[in-house]
Amino acid sequence: MIDSNKPTAMMLGRWQPWHQGHQMLFEKSLEKTGQVIIMVRDTPRDDSNPFGFEEVKARIEKALVDFTGKFNIIKVPNITNICYGRGVGYKIEEIILPQQIQEISATKIREELND
């Protein structure tokens, strides 16, 4: 369980499925604050979103077993717009991952899982 009073990084996505790129993003985010909230968008199930929240959560927890206590996973609505005002008290950062990680295709991973 994370401490709600401590600085926390936030990751928002579908995580369909959680893969090496997501893992690296998590680890880089964790370096920033020491704890991360992982928000799973509640998207309609289709070919691009074949996994329900509980399955996504289980896959993430399995991948992050070494980081237990440093993250929480929550289900959120299908957020499509992120709006903010002055940004008082928080940073908005893009974490640039290596090109080989950026080239990971969740679509290809889903196709391989279906074969």
Q: Could you say what each language-model-derived stretch is?
A:
Residues 1-115:
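Nucleotidyltransferase catalytic core that binds NTPs
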